[in-house]
UniProtKB/Swiss-Prot annotation:
One of its GO terms (cellular component) is nucleus. Cell-cycle arrest properties are inactivated by phosphorylation on Thr-332, Ser-640, Ser-959 and Ser-970 by CDK4. Its main location: nucleus. Belongs to the retinoblastoma protein (RB) family. This is Retinoblastoma-like protein 1. It comes from Mus musculus. GO terms for molecular function: promoter-specific chromatin binding. It is found in: Nucleus. Keywords: Cell cycle, Chromatin regulator, Nucleus, Phosphoprotein, Repressor, Transcription, Transcription regulation, Tumor suppressor. Residues 780-944 are annotated as: Domain B. One of its GO terms (biological process) is negative regulation of cellular senescence.
Length: 1063
C-alpha cells in the first residue's frame, strides 16, 4: 500500500513507523485490527502535518485512539471497550510521560478532528490525573506526619517463599494506603475528579489505617511518636487501646486544610459502608488489617481488584505514583531523605518544575485572570496548594452563608410586601423547581459525568439557596436606594432574573467544590439561554463582596465565554432579539457611553468624524462634574452605570410598562408626538430621531440650532436640532429627543443639562428620574436596552483583546483603528459570520486583512503567537472553525457583495428545530479566511488601501475605539485588612501652600510630615471641593478670571451638553 509514496524518504519513514508499531503491539499483545487502524491514522496525519519529536510518541497517541474505539465481546456484560490495554501500559512501553501524552494528544485530536465525545473523555482523564497528582502531593506529608518515614527504612532482605511472614514495613503501609484510596475512589466515580471530596476520602483512608495501627498491639511501631493525634497516654508503659477505634478526622482536618463536616459526611455515608462491603466480599479480612496473618493477603487482594478496575472501567493506573520511575513516567515530585545526592535533588526539582508549569498552563484549579473584569478582583492571597485553595473556597463560601437560612430574611420579606404584587409565592416556586431539576441531573449518570449521591446534591443546593436569598436581598436594597421608592414588582416578577441568579449561585457552589460539572453544565440542565444568563454575572460580583479572587476570575471568564461564543450559537436567543429590533445591529458608537471613547488623533473625542467641528473648550471643573470623578461623594457613587432594572427591562421613555429582554422600541416620547401631531413643524421631511441618526461619509454634521414648539399644556419648549448636510446640498434638521415634562430638584443627582449648570433645571417625571439617577453626569448611549447592553459588552471585550494584541505586535494606533473598523463592519453588516463561531476568529481575520491592505503586514504566525499568550486562547478557536453547516446555519457567500437587509433577516431568524443532525464542515482559521471571510470583507477592506487613489475617497470614516480606564474603581482599596487606598495621580495645577500640606518622599524635610500628622491628630476636616460658579469669584486665587459674559458661557455650555448627549 506504500509503493505509491512519492519520495523514498517518505516510504522509509512509514516503514520505520510500521516496525516501531509492530514492536509496540507485540509488547502490549495487541490485536492486528487496532494496530492496522493506528498505522492508517498515523500515515494519514503524517501526510498532512509535520510531526515533531519521536515517532513512537505519536504512534502511542494513534494506538490509544484505536484501542478506545475497539469493542470486545465479554461473557457477562456483553461488550467491553478498550482491548484490555491500559493507558499506563501504552505509555510505559512507548516511554512517554503522562504530561507529554496530554500535550501530544491535544494536537493529535485537532489534527485528526476527533469527535467531541472523545475530547471530553481526554479532558476528564486529564482532570482525574491532575486531581490524583495534587492528592498524592498532599498524601506524602500527611502520611509522614502520622507514621514513620518510609524513605528512611533499610531495604528488605531477599527471602525464600518458605520463610515465615514478616510484619509489613512502613513502605508497604504507604503503598497499601494509597492503593486502597485509589480503588475506593474508583468505586465512587462521582468523587473521582472532585478535588474536595477526593481529599476527604484520602483522610478517611488514613484514619482507617491509623486506627488499625493503634488497635494492633504489635504494630504501634509504625506510628510517628510526635503525631498530635495520638492518645494522651500513648507513651505510657501500660498504654492500652480503647475498645472503639479512635477517629482522627478532626485532627487531620485541623492540621491539613480539611473541612470537618464534609470529611465526616464522606466517612459515615460512603467510606464506612464501602469498607464493610469489602469485608463481606472477603477482599479485606482479619480483625486488624495490619495483622501479620492478614496484611499480605489484604494487600494482594486490593491490588488485584484495582487492576481489574483499570482494565475494565478505568484508564489511568494511579499506582504509577508509587513506582520507582514515577519521575520519568508522570513527573510526580518524590520525597527524599537528607542524604539524597545533590544531582538527584536537581533532577527532582526539574521534574517538579515541569509539573508545576503544566498545572499553571492548564489552570484547572486556579483560573487564569481574564483580560476584562479585573477591576472587581481583590488583592492576591497567600500562595497555597490546590487542596488548601479548594477547601478554603468551601470554607469561605460557608462563612458567607453562616447563620443564614435558605429562605427570605425579614428585610427581604418587607421588600416583597412593599411591592404592588407580593412576588414571594412565585419566587419560592421558581427556586423549588430549579432545586428539583438540579438534584435530578446532579445524581443522574450520563456519558459525560457519573451521577453523584443525593446527599451531595442536597448539600450543594442548600448552600446555593442561602446564597441566592442573600444576594437577592443585597440587590433589592441597592436598587431601592438607587431608584428611590420605585416599585420593585417589575424586576421581581421576571422569572428569567430569578432563574439566572439561582443558576449563578449554583455555579459558585460547584466551582468552590472544584466540581467536574463545569460551566456551561448548569445552564444546560436548567435550559437557560446564555444570552440571558450573562446579565446577572456582573450584578452578583458587585453585590457579594465575600467572593474570593478565584471566584471572581471564574465568573468573569464565564461572561467572556458567553460574549465570545456561547451567545452566538445557531439556536441562541440573540437572533430572536436581533429580529425583534428590525435586524439592526448596533454599532460601537451607538452603545458605548460617549465619554468612554479614546481621544482621536486630532485631539477631539470625535476623531472618527473629521469634518465635525471641535467641541468648545471645557472648563476643568465642568469636566470633573460631568465624569465619574465629580463632586459626588465616593460612597454615594453608583456601583454601576447600568442598574439591574435596566438589565432586565427595556421601557419606552415615560412608560411604566417594560418588555423583558427586548431591545428598546422606537422612541415615541411626548416630544415626538408634539412634533408629529401638535404643531406639525415642517423643518424637514425626515422623522428620524437623534438616536437612530447615522451619518454617512458623504454627510457633514453642522452646528446646533434650536426651535420652539408649544405642547398640549400650552408650555413653550426649546428643542435643539441637528443640522445634516448631504451631497445634494440639502440640510436636514433633526430634533434631539427630550421630554419637556421632566421634573427634578436642583439637589438631585440627575443627568447634567446646561440649565442645571446655571441653577435652573427642567422638570422630570418620577419614573424617568428613577431610571436616570444613576447616570450622574454621564450621557446615555444612543441605544439602550437588552440588545445594546449585550453589544456594549461584546465591543468592550473585543477592544480589550485587540488592544492587547496590538501592544504585543507593536501596531500603530492608525492601523488598530482600521482593524477595529473592519471588525465592527463584520458584526454590524455581516452578523451571520458570527453564527456558531468565535469572536476571536473574526478579530484575528480583521487584524490580518487590514494589516495586509495597509502594507503594515504581520505574518499569520506572528499574530497567532501573540494571540496564544492571551488567557482565553484555546487551540480549537483557530484549528476548528465552521466553514458551513447543512441544513440551515451559515450561508457561504461568493463574491464581494455586501449583505442586503433580506440576507440579514434570513440570517438572524432562528431556524426550526429539525430531528436531523446538522452536518458541519470545519477547517482551520486560514481555510475559513480564504474560503469565507475574504469574500465578504474584501471590498470593504480595500477601501483603506492607500496605494489606490480611487479607494481613498470611498473609505468610510474610522470607527471610534473604546477607551479603557486604568483605575475605574478609584480610589481602590488594595488590602481588605487595612484601610489603604490607591488612586492615580491627577494631572493639574500644583497644590498651593494655602490650600494643602505637601510632602514629597526623599525630597521634603521631616517637619512637613510632622505637620501633616499633627493636622490628622487634631481631626481637621478635609477641605470641601468648590462647586462651579458662573459669576466671577475675585477671592479665589486658583480660579482664572472668565473673560466672557454669562450669555456667551451659557451658549458654550449648551453646545457641550447637546454635543455630549448625542455622540
Amino acid at each position: 500500500m506504500f509503493e505509491d509514496e512519492p519520495h523514498a524518504e517518505g516510504a522509509a519513514a512509514v516503514a520505520a513507523a510500521r516496525e516501531a508499531l509492530q514492536a509496540l503491539c507485540q509488547e502490549l499483545n495487541l490485536d492486528e485490527g487496532s494496530a492496522a487502524e493506528a498505522l492508517d491514522d498515523f500515515t494519514a496525519i503524517r501526510g498532512n502535518y509535520s510531526l515533531e519529536g519521536e515517532v513512537i510518541h505519536w504512534l502511542a497517541c494513534s494506538l490509544y485512539v484505536a484501542c478506545r474505539k475497539s469493542i470486545i465481546p465479554t461473557v457477562g456484560k456483553g461488550v467491553m471497550e478498550g482491548n484490555c490495554v491500559s493507558l499506563t501500559r501504552i505509555l510505559r512501553s512507548a516511554k512517554l510521560s503522562l504530561i507529554q501524552f496530554f500535550s501530544k494528544m491535544k494536537k493529535w485530536m485537532d489534527m485528526s478532528n476527533l469527535p467531541q465525545e472523545f475530547r471530553e473523555r481526554i479532558e476528564r482523564l486529564e482532570r482525574n490525573f491532575e486531581v490524583s497528582t495534587v492528592i498524592f502531593k498532599k498524601f506524602e506529608p500527611i502520611f509522614l506526619d502520622i507514621f514513620q518515614n518510609p524513605y528512611e527504612e533499610p531495604p528488605k532482605l531477599p527471602r525464600s517463599r518458605k520463610q515465615r511472614r514478616i510484619p509489613c514495613s512502613v513502605k508497604d503501609l504507604f503503598n497499601f494506603c494509597w492503593t486502597l484510596f485509589v480503588y475506593t475512589k474508583g468505586n465512587f466515580r462521582m468523587i473521582g475528579d472532585d478535588l474536595v471530596n477526593s481529599y476527604h476520602l484520602l483522610l478517611c483512608c488514613l484514619d482507617l489505617i491509623f486506627a488499625n495501627a493503634i488497635m494492633c498491639p504489635n504494630r504501634r511501631d509504625l506510628l510517628n511518636p510526635s503525631f498530635k493525634g495520638l492518645p494522651s497516654d500513648f507513651h505510657a508503659p501500660d498504654f492500652k487501646a480503647a475498645e472503639e477505634p479512635p477517629c482522627i478526622i478532626a485532627v487531620l482536618c485541623d492540621l491539613h486544610d480539611g473541612l470537618l463536616v464534609e470529611a465526616k459526611g464522606i466517612k459515615e455515608h460512603y467510606f464506612k459502608p464501602y469498607i464493610s462491603k469489602l469485608f463481606d466480599k472477603k477482599i479485606l479480612k482479619g480483625e486488624c488489617l495490619l495483622d501479620l496473618s492478614s496484611f499480605t493477603d489484604n494487600s494482594k487482594a486490593v491490588n488485584k481488584e484495582y487492576e481489574e478496575y483499570v482494565l475494565t472501567v478505568g484508564d489511568f493506573d494511579e499506582r504509577i505514583f508509587l513506582g520507582a520511575d514515577a519521575e520519568e513516567e508522570i513527573g510526580t515530585p518524590r520525597k527524599f531523605t537528607a542524604d539524597t545526592p545533590f544531582g538527584k535533588l536537581t533532577s527532582q526539582a526539574s521534574v517538579e518544575c515541569n509539573l508545576q508549569q503544566h498545572f499553571e498552563k492548564k489552570r484547572s484549579f486556579a483560573p487564569s485572570t481574564p483580560l476584562t473584569g479585573r477591576r472587581y478582583l481583590q488583592e492576591k492571597e497567600a500562595v497555597t496548594t490546590p487542596v488548601a485553595s479548594a477547601t478554603q473556597s468551601v470554607s469561605r463560601l460557608q462563612s458567607i452563608v453562616a447563620g443564614l437560612k435558605s429562605a427570605p430574611s425579614e428585610q427581604l420579606l418587607n421588600i416583597f410586601e412593599s411591592c404592588m404584587r407580593n412576588p414571594m409565592g412565585n419566587i419560592i416556586k421558581i427556586v423549588k423547581g430549579i432545586g428539583e431539576t438540579f438534584c435530578q441531573h446532579y445524581t443522574q449518570s450520563t456519558d459525560k459525568q457519573p451521577g453523584s449521591h443525593i446527599d451531595f446534591a442536597v448539600n450543594r443546593l442548600k448552600l446555593a439557596e442561602i446564597l441566592y436569598y442573600k444576594i437577592l436581598e443585597t440587590i433589592m436594597v441597592q436598587e431601592t436606594r438607587r431608584l428611590h421608592g420605585m416599585d420593585m414588582s417589575v424586576l421581581l416578577e421576571q422569572d428569567i432574573f430569578h432563574k439566572s441568579l439561582m443558576a449563578c449561585c449554583l455555579e459558585i457552589v460547584l466551582f468552590a467544590y472544584s466540581s467536574p460539572r463545569t460551566f456551561p453544565w448548569i445552564i444546560e440542565v436548567l435550559d437557560l439561554q446564555p444570552f440571558y444568563f450573562y446579565k446577572v454575572i456582573e450584578v452578583v460580583i458587585r453585590s457579594e463582596e465575600g467572593l474570593s479572587r478565584d471566584m471572581v476570575k471564574h465568573l468573569n471568564s464565564i461572561e467572556e465565554q458567553i460574549l465570545e461564543s456561547l451567545a452566538w450559537t445557531n439556536n441562541s436567543a440573540l437572533w430572536e432579539a436581533l429580529h425583534a429590533s428590525a435586524n439592526r445591529v448596533p454599532s460601537c458608537e451607538e452603545v458605548i457611553f460617549p465619554n468612554n471613547f479614546e481621544i482621536g488623533n486630532g485631539g477631539n473625542v470625535q476623531g472618527h468624524l473629521p469634518m465635525m467641528p471641535m467641541s468648545p473648550i471645557i472648563h476643568p471643573r465642568v469636566k470633573e462634574v460631568r465624569t465619574d470623578s465629580g463632586s459626588l461623594r465616593q460612597d454615594m457613587q453608583p456601583l454601576s452605570p447600568i442598574s439591574v432594572h435596566e438589565r432586565y427591562s427595556s421601557p419606552a421613555a415615560g412608560s411604566a410598562k417594560r418588555r423583558l429582554f427586548g431591545d428598546d422600541p422606537p422612541k415615541d416620547t411626548l416630544m415626538d408626538k408634539i412634533m408629529a401631531e401638535g404643531t406639525k413643524l415642517k423643518i424637514a421631511p425626515s422623522s428620524v430621531t437623534a438616536e437612530s441618526l447615522s451619518i454617512s461619509p458623504g454627510q457633514a454634521l453642522l452646528t446646533m440650532a434650536t426651535t420652539t414648539v408649544t405642547g398640549t399644556t400650552g408650555r413653550k419648549v426649546t428643542v435643539p436640532l441637528h443640522g445634516i448636510a448631504n451631497d445634494a446640498g440639502e440640510i436636514t434638521l433633526v430634533p434631539i429627543s427630550m421630554n419637556p415634562t421632566q421634573e427634578s430638584t436642583a439637589e438631585s443627582p440627575v443627568s447634567l443639562t446646561a440649565q442645571s449648570l446655571i441653577g435652573t433645571s427642567p422638570k422630570q417625571t418620577h419614573l424617568t428620574k428613577a431610571q436616570d439617577a444613576h447616570l450622574t453626569g454621564v450621557s446615555k448611549p444612543k441605544r439602550t436596552g437588552s440588545l445594546a447592553l449585550f453589544y456594549r459588552k461584546v465591543y468592550h471585550l473585543a477592544s480589550v483583546r485587540l488592544r492587547d494584541l496590538c501592544l504585543k505586535l507593536d501596531v500603530s494606533n492608525e492601523l488598530r483603528r482600521k482593524i477595529w473598523t473592519c471588525f465592527e463592519f463584520t458584526l454590524v453588516h455581516c452578523p451571520d459570520l458570527m453564527k456558531d463561531r468565535h469572536l476571536d476568529q473574526l478579530l484575528l481575520c480583521a487584524f490580518y486583512i487590514m494589516a495586509k491592505v495597509t502594507k503594515e503586514e504581520r505574518t499569520f504566525q506572528e499574530i497567532m503567537k501573540s494571540y496564544r499568550n492571551q488567557p482565553q486562547a484555546n487551540s480549537h478557536v483557530y484549528r476548528s472553525v465552521l466553514l458551513k453547516s447543512i441544513p440551515g446555519g451559515v450561508v457561504v457567500y461568493n463574491g464581494d457583495c455586501e449583505m442586503t437587509d433580506g440576507d440579514i433577516e434570513d440570517a438572524t431568524k432562528t431556524p426550526n428545530c429539525s430531528s436531523e443532525p446538522v452536518k458541519e464542515e470545519r477547517g482551520d482559521l486560514i481555510k475559513f479566511y480564504n474560503t469565507v471571510y475574504v469574500g465578504r470583507v474584501k471590498s470593504f477592506a480595500l477601501k483603506y488601501d492607500l496605494s489606490n487613489q480611487d479607494h481613498i475617497m470611498d473609505a468610510p470614516p474610522l470607527s471610534p475605539f473604546p477607551h479603557i480606564k486604568q483605575q475605574p474603581g478609584s480610589p481602590r482599596r488594595i488590602s481588605q485588612q487595612h484601610s489603604l487606598y490607591v488612586s492615580p495621580h491627577k494631572n493639574g495645577a500644583g497644590l498651593t501652600p494655602r490650600s494643602a500640606l505637601l510632602y514629597k518622599f526623599n525630597g521634603s524635610p521631616s517637619k512637613s510630615l510632622k505637620d501633616i500628622n499633627n493636622m490628622i491628630r487634631q481631626g481637621e476636616q478635609k477641605t470641601k471641593k468648590r462647586v462651579i460658579a458662573i459669576s466671577g469669584d475675585a477671592d479665589s486665587p486658583a480660579k482664572r478670571l472668565c473673560q466672557e459674559n454669562d450669555d456667551v458661557l451659557l451658549k458654550r455650555l449648551q453646545d457641550v451638553v447637546s454635543e455630549r448627549a448625542n455622540h
